[in-house]
Amino acid sequence: MGIVVIGAVFVDIKGYPLSTYIPGGRNAGRVEQVHGGVSRNVAEDIANVELRPTFVGLVDDTGMGLDVIEKLNNHKVNTRFIQRVPYGMGTWLAIFNNDGDVCAAISKRPDTTPLIGLLEEQGDEIFRDCDSIALELDLEKETVKQTLRYAKKYGKKVYAVVSNMSIAMERRDFLQQIDCFVCNQQEAGLLFSDDYGHLEPEEMCRVLAANVWSANIPCMVVTMGDKGAVYAQADGDCGIVPAKKVDVIDTTGAGDAFFAGTVIGLTYGKTLAESCEIGSRLAASVICITENVCPRFRPLEFGLDVPVVD
């Protein structure tokens, strides 16, 4: 069944200025509406490496919801476990500056409680034969608990990402049961009640290693934008992964692609350092295009001996 990805679907509304962006002022520009959401992006990123993930989530019972399912199907994502419900998708509104970075954003989260019933009814079928689980940690607490129970039952690795750290903080204790947690530098500061914005990778790496040990978190990766990423494991192993140098067009989805690449590597036999390198390559490929997911790759390009199923 490949990697199972569990999470929410969003509609991304993105505004780009046509001239110099003026904070607080009126800006002429263009507005785009695309399918988004951390987990939806992750599922499509995995599929774009010619792997065949399964997406477990919700969409609206509207034409837009059908469009989301159809696009995922076209990318060879298994959509059997996507439910269509009223208000099943959230909305993310973002304004970009001239460097392609988000300078303001606001989101409306969907109601994901129907996932609880879905996992109760079909959880065994979903998780029994999967290769690993990629989980959006800020889902309903019961959904996270259910996923971790199934993972323990069937001996599956669980990798977690977050879209709203304020909500995920309420699930902080679950991190001790997560095989690897990926977040950005700002989110790491929230997680450990500190400010890491001024830290360079070398110092961030040392701080992270101390934190995962004291918090009993098995493994954690922190992305640092154009400074790359750092990783640390509870056994003391830690390191730095430099960022790829590319021309920035749109940073949307770069973190999701990094997470997808890291999960792919860890699932199919790579070390944590090698997996982060795959994540770094996928993130770089997203930054230099207007799409919020990576372009098509083949597993062999990342040294993965995984059969491509057409």
PLM regions with names:
Residues R84, A94-S132, L137:
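Conserved phosphate-binding/catalytic loop of the ribokinase/pfkB sugar-kinase fold
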Residues S132-R206, K227-G228:
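Conserved beta-alpha-beta core of the PfkB/ribokinase-like small-molecule kinase fold
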Residues I3, N27, D194, H198-D310:
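Conserved phosphate-binding/catalytic region of the ribokinase-like
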Residues K71-P86:
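A glycine-rich helix N-cap at a beta->alpha junction
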